[in-house]
């Protein structure tokens, strides 16, 4: 969006920025102060704020180790610039991963407009057009410092984005002070904390400070030209622009004068000596304004000497431009001498230049020491490498000269040992014989041990074979006995043999004793059938009982479900009726309130200007500084000690 607007600025010029030309620097600062207050209030509630086309204020959580495997969890505020702006201008910022449970709310222009005497369109236009100026300044590779009142300073230097928070703001966020201390002691966040002394410092001329925007270029220059930081002619154009804006204030469209009057009553103007002097000089010189900002540059010394105020000996009018000052305060304001900081600023610029030169010399010296150290290390490494190569070459040559090396020798004819070594030889021979005896004994013991182990293994194997043989015989005998018992049972239960054959017999041969067997068989079958019938009846009875129990359970479940459904329907109907009744009551209450408000608005519109207390107070003018009447010429509210009361002889 910003690049599209930046291109459109070249074609449309002043038409793209309709709001900023009608606002002064103080009004822009007031609007951005309200924006900063809204952001600070949301951050206090642990909510993030998203500024459209600029960035997001939110929190990140980090674990800081404190030793002994202990850590503390801190939640520190961060500013994340929008990715579109970063990509367009090629900026660099630290990658920050924010937790998803922190809510992010957009910038509410309505709430900001309610905090000041500006409507929503003016606030939104001021914010957006200020961000356009910021984008243009970044595109021209200028150093920018964007101040958020009560929060911190956003610094953009050398295409690097850094948000530095005030120490008081961090203490407000944390409460215990551990957050500011932890950020100041960590290497990555040591430059994220801005002390109160650094916050009151003056910006160098190469840094463009926001949100105090110089609108001097919009009248006579193209919108995309560079911002000139010198004072000179640009200061005069700024004065002309302020005069034009003062003239346009009379023709500005105001939707609700009484609402604006109420807002002004809620936010009274803070009048200082400098602002009073500016308005007095405006009425005297016909529109030329003197501000302390125009006196803060070294190149403005000549203009400062020419533009010093001329004080008048007496008071001409007490109500110039709505000042409402008494004679004493007006004379004091006219005799105030402005402070000129040109020499101090020139000294500060010179100190900064010397500090930069000293820092550059230190950096060059450190770089030279590093280079010398690297060169010495390189030379030492070269010497070590050459020495190692020489040693390796010498070892290789030595090996090539003596390729074979014998460690033992064979003598054909060994000379006899001298007589002095005879005792040693005997001792050696005795020790050798002893060693041989010990070795033979060990061999004999080992052989005997092996023979013993072999015999034990043979005995164990013989016992195992005997046990297996006994078990086999036992199993065989048991199997034989089993077969024998089976044959005996078969012989015992063997059916009767066929009757002997008798030729030409008149009596029946088969079926003589079958009647008893048939009767017994029938009885047995009857008993079987009776038992089966009883079992079937019992099974059928159990099935019927289970079915009845299931039906009863289902019926109870259906009844309970029906009762619950009816209860839910009743509760839902009651809730709907209650909601409808509440909505109806709210509607009636809202209608009554709207009717009452309309009546009050109509009565307010019909009322005259002299009916209200604040309007009546306008008849009694008071000095804005000492709160005395405007006709005051030096009287005191204190009762004098030597006051003589008329009609009394007492001297108080």
From Swiss-Prot:
- Subcellular location field: Cytoplasm, Cytoskeleton, Microtubule organizing center, Centrosome
In this UniProt entry, the residues modified to Phosphoserine are 206, 275, 296, 417
Presence of keyword Transmembrane = no
Protein's UniProt keywords contain Iron:
no
Query: What segment(s) does the record annotate as region Disordered?
Result: 238-258
GO cellular component entries: centrosome; ciliary basal body; cytoplasm; microtubule organizing center; plasma membrane
Using the record for this protein, list the coiled-coil segments as residue ranges, or answer none.
436-493
Q: Which UniProt keywords apply?
A: Coiled coil, Cytoplasm, Cytoskeleton, Phosphoprotein
What's a Pfam family in this record?
HU-CCDC81_euk_2
Q: Which domain of life is it from?
A: Eukaryota
Which stretches are tagged as biased composition: Basic and acidic residues?
238-256
- InterPro entries the UniProt entry points to: CCDC81_HU_dom_2 (IPR040673), Coiled-coil_dom_cont_p_81 (IPR026295), HU-CCDC81 (IPR028034)
Protein name, entry field: Coiled-coil domain-containing protein 81
- Which organism is this entry from? Homo sapiens (Human)
Taxonomic placement: Eukaryota, Metazoa, Chordata, Craniata, Vertebrata
Query: What would be the name of the gene that encodes this protein?
Result: CCDC81
